[in-house]
Amino acid sequence: MNKLKVTLLASSVVLAATLLSACGSNQSSSTSTKKLKAGNFDVAYQNPDKAIKGGNLKVAYQSDSPMKAQWLSGLSNDATFATMSGPGGGQDGLFFTDSGFKFIKGGAADVALDKESKTATITLRKDLKWSDGSEVTAKDYEFTYETIANPAYGSDRWTDSLANIVGLSDYHTGKAKTISGITFPDGENGKVIKVQFKEMKPGMTQSGNGYFLETVAPYQYLKDVAPKDLASSPKTTTKPLVTGPFKPENVVAGESIKYVPNPYYWGEKPKLNSITYEVVSTAKSVAALSSSKYDIINGMVSSQYKQVKNLKGYKVLGQQAMYISLMYYNLGHYDAKNSINVQDRKTPLQDQNVRQAIGYARNVAEVDNKFSNGLSTPANSLIPPIFKQFTSSSVKGYEKQDLDKANKLLDEDGWKLNKSTGYREKDGKELSLVYAARVGDANAETIAQNYIQQWKKIGVKVSLYNGKLMEFNSWVDHMTTPPGANDWDITDGSWSLASEPSQQDLFSAAAPYNFGHFNDSEITKDLNDIDSAKSENPTYRKAAFVKYQEDMNKKAYVIPTNFMLNYTPVNKRVVGMTLDYGAMNTWSEIGVSSAKLATK
C-alpha cells in the first residue's frame, strides 16, 4: 500500500480520491480467490484465462492537471503521482499490512514495537536494493526523516505526530544537527534502525499512523544535492532510484511514466514486460475506454459511472474509499518558523454560528443524488465508514440541509437581512465571502454555483475566487504555501486518508495541512486523547473518536461533505487485478491474457 499519511486529491469534489492504485498500491498481495464485495461492486476481477508471458499493461490516471513527479514521499503531495508511482514502490513504502491495515511480516522491512523501551525497531530485508543495485541501508530510512524535518528541504509534512520521536523537534528547529532518537545498531550501512519515542501510541500497530515513517530515500544517490534543490532535481523527479517490482524507464514531465521490470527487486519477478502509466483528462477518459486505449483508469469520478459501467470489454471493480471531502473556513495563518497554526484572521467566520449556518445551508444530499450515481453519500463526520470501529450513527453533522436552522443561527448572531439587497448585514458590513472552489469534473462549476445559490437563500453573499474556478495545482500552492493566503474565506477539499484514522496530521495545531488554520485547545485535547495510552483500550478509543467527531461538528471549523465508494474499470484481458486493501504483491502478479485489449 501507499503509505503516505494523507494525500491531497485532485478530482471529484475538490481534491479527489487516490483510490489507492488500480493495482493495489505499493505492492499489493497475492490475488485472492475470495469473493470480496464493496457495496454492489466486486473488489477483484477473476479472469478465467491465464496470463501470457510478458505484455504491456496500459494504465491511466484521470486528472485535469499535470502530474507533479516527486519520488521522495516527504516532498510529494500530489495524489495523481502518488498513485502513478505504485509500480515503482509507491515512493518506496516498506511494510506489508493485512486488510485491516495492521502491520504484518514479509515486506521490504518488518517493524517490531517495544512498549517497555518505547521503541520501534525497523529491520530491512538483507536483499533489499535500489534499482541501480546498491544496498538499501539504515541511513536511507533515517534520511527520509531529514527531508521532512529539516526546513531547508521545503517539505510540508512536518506534524505533531513526528515530534513524538526523541530529538526530532530539536533537529527540526535547528537546535541539533542530528536526530538523537534514531540510531543504527549495525551502523549507517546496516539494515537495522531503532526509533526512540517519548510515548507509545495505540495507533502505532497500524500503517499510516504518522508516528514513524514507512519509506526510504537513497541517501548516497542524493547526498550531494543541495536541500533547496532536491525537490526539483532530476534525481527525484525524472531519474529516480526505486525499490519496487518495476523501475521508471522514462518520465515525461506532467504526462506519463514508462515502467520496466526492476532486476534488483527483492520479491516475485513481474509477469509483465512493461507498464505505461499516463494522465488522461476528464473530457477524454470515457472515449479512451470506449476505444480500448487503456486496461485500467484510476481516478474516474462518480458523474462518469453511468457512461462506463456497461462498456464492452471492461469489468468495473469497487472498494470503500479511505476518503473524506469537506469544506474549510479560512480563520488564520500558518507560522512556519514556530510550526503552529494561528487563528487570528479578522472574519465573520470566527463566529461558530456563522460557520454552522453556512454548513446547514448546503444541499449535499441533493447534489449527490443528481451527480454521484449513488457513489457518494453525505458525510455525518470526518471519519469514513470503512473505519466502522471508530464511528457511530449517533454523530449528527450537516448531511441534511436545514435552511430554517441556518437562518435562526444568523438571526441569533445579529445578522439582519437587508431586504433591498437580499443579504445580511451587521455593524454596517455585509456578510460577503469569497469561495475558492476549484476545477474538477464537468459538474464542478454547476455544483459550486448551486452552493452559492443556497447560501444566498440565507442572506450570505458568496462569490467565486477571481470570478472563476481555480486550477488544481494553483489551488494547492495557494493553500499550502506558508503563511497561507488571506484572500479567500471558503474552500473545499478532499483527502485520501491514512489507514490509521487519527487526524493529527490534518487538524492538529501544528499541521500544515490544517488549511483553515484553526487552533482550538479542546480539539487538541480530543486528538491527543485518541492517541493516548488510555486508547490502547478499543472501547475507550472508540469513545474518544466519537467525542472528537461530535466536537468538530459542533465547532464547525470544517464541515464534512461526502464519503465515497471508489470504482475502477478494468479491461477483461487483465489477470490478477484486485482492489483488496490486504493485497500486497499485485504489481508483481498482475498480467494480461492476450496481446490486445478485450473488446467484448
From Swiss-Prot:
<dbReference type="GO" id="GO:0015833">
    <property type="term" value="P:peptide transport"/>
</dbReference>
<keyword id="KW-0472">Membrane</keyword>
<comment type="subunit">
    <text>The complex is composed of two ATP-binding proteins (OppD and OppF), two transmembrane proteins (OppB and OppC) and a solute-binding protein (OppA).</text>
</comment>
<keyword id="KW-0653">Protein transport</keyword>
<dbReference type="InterPro" id="IPR030678">
    <property type="entry name" value="Peptide/Ni-bd"/>
</dbReference>
<dbReference type="InterPro" id="IPR023765">
    <property type="entry name" value="SBP_5_CS"/>
</dbReference>
<feature type="lipid moiety-binding region" description="N-palmitoyl cysteine">
    <location>
        <position position="23"/>
    </location>
</feature>
<keyword id="KW-1003">Cell membrane</keyword>
<feature type="lipid moiety-binding region" description="S-diacylglycerol cysteine">
    <location>
        <position position="23"/>
    </location>
</feature>
<comment type="function">
    <text>Part of the ABC transporter complex OppABCDF involved in the uptake of oligopeptides. Essential for uptake of peptides larger than three amino acids and for growth in milk.</text>
</comment>
<keyword id="KW-0571">Peptide transport</keyword>
<keyword id="KW-0732">Signal</keyword>
<keyword id="KW-0564">Palmitate</keyword>
<keyword id="KW-0449">Lipoprotein</keyword>
<dbReference type="InterPro" id="IPR039424">
    <property type="entry name" value="SBP_5"/>
</dbReference>
<protein>
    <recommendedName>
        <fullName>Oligopeptide-binding protein OppA</fullName>
    </recommendedName>
</protein>
<dbReference type="GO" id="GO:0042597">
    <property type="term" value="C:periplasmic space"/>
</dbReference>
<feature type="signal peptide">
    <location>
        <begin position="1"/>
        <end position="22"/>
    </location>
</feature>
<dbReference type="Pfam" id="PF00496">
    <property type="entry name" value="SBP_bac_5"/>
</dbReference>
<dbReference type="GO" id="GO:0015031">
    <property type="term" value="P:protein transport"/>
</dbReference>
<dbReference type="InterPro" id="IPR000914">
    <property type="entry name" value="SBP_5_dom"/>
</dbReference>
<comment type="similarity">
    <text>Belongs to the bacterial solute-binding protein 5 family.</text>
</comment>
<dbReference type="GO" id="GO:1904680">
    <property type="term" value="F:peptide transmembrane transporter activity"/>
</dbReference>
<dbReference type="GO" id="GO:0043190">
    <property type="term" value="C:ATP-binding cassette (ABC) transporter complex"/>
</dbReference>
<keyword id="KW-0813">Transport</keyword>
